[in-house]
Amino acid sequence: MLGLAGFFIYIYLFHVDILGIIATAQTANPLIYAVAILFGLMEVLFFTISWRELTNYLSIKMSIGRAYLYVWYGLYVDTIVPAQSISGEVTRTYLLIRDKCGPFGKIVASLFAHRLLGMAINVVALIAGIILLYFGGQTSPIVFNLIIIVTITITALIFLMVIFSYKQRWTLKTITWATKIAQKITFGRWKSGKLKDQAIEITEHFHNAMKEFRYNPKSIATSLFYLTVTWIFSLSVPYLVFLSLDHPVSWSMILITSSIVLAVKAIPVGIPFEVGLPEAVMTTLYFSMGVPPALAATATILVRIITLWMRFFIGFVAQQYLELKPSKSPTANPEKTKIHPQL
């Protein structure tokens, strides 16, 4: 609630008419807004299908219904844990391990690859947005510089993550270095042999799974297709919200604002980004692109009802269901991931 209070303080400091916000919200077309809500649900569904395409290839046993619940559970944790950028993935990892769906290394590989695909699409969306703005004559120097910084940051992270995923020796050296440090800190009292062996086994599963993706682009392409559909639904939500307020906006503005917000959330640095800060960022970006202040704040609130509060409550229901009814699915196929010969 502190985040929401901060958002309303932000509105007050920038002299946004709160009564105007309420009056504008009351004019929203309920039918169009209902479609926006439906698109918000479809966004999560296709995100789930995209991720499950990767888990299926790695023989991680999980039905589409179960995967959908896992994603909703992760979204719920995203809103309450101040490490939003990775908390949902950690939650899904925990659930898959708890329900014995597959080896830890393979599970992490599926989430790692899925995050890489999402970040790549984000970069494409940012570039497309700035091109549309440029040719539309709406380019703001501040927004342009922000997009450049975000795009470079995400691209650099993608590059580093790809290198890490294929350099098994680096990971093994990191494990060895970490265990030596731990032994020095504990003066040799901590016996790290068993834990080190487990870490090496997990690392092998992870890197073998990433090699499998490398030699089978079909699963990556299919996942990328569904993730693209996810993005279309995601971008349609704010567009429909503005449409419901009888204020159509350009797709370039939607691309830019959505990409910047999602880009910051995608950077794994543990920023508590779910309540307060995104509202301020969205309102500022809308205003900087010519949307009246009261309308910008109203649209932000209506969008966040769908992308935050609806997810919070549905995620809470999913969390309760999964905790009360753990999976009874059989243990995943113990066969290790095959390693293709190096070309």
PLM regions: where:
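Short intracellular "coupling" helices and adjacent cytoplasmic loop segments at the cytosolic face
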Residues: W72-V90, R98, T186-L195
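Membrane-interface alpha-helices at helix entry/exit sites of multi-pass transporters
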Residues: G65-L69, Q84, G88, K100-L116, ...
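Mid-bilayer segments of alpha-helical transmembrane spans in multi-pass integral membrane proteins
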Residues: L75-I86, P103, R115-I127, I131
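Interfacial segments of multi-pass membrane proteins
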Residues: L95-P103, E279-L295
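Helix-loop junctions and terminal segments of transmembrane helices
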Residues: R52, V90-Y94
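Transmembrane alpha-helix interface/packing and boundary motifs in multi-pass membrane proteins
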Residues: Y76-A83, S259-E279
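Predominantly cytoplasmic-facing regulatory/coupling regions of multi-pass membrane proteins
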Residues: M1-W72, L132, P141-L262, A266, ...
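Alpha-helical transmembrane segments of multi-pass membrane proteins
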Residues: Y73-D78, A109-I121, Y226, T298-T307
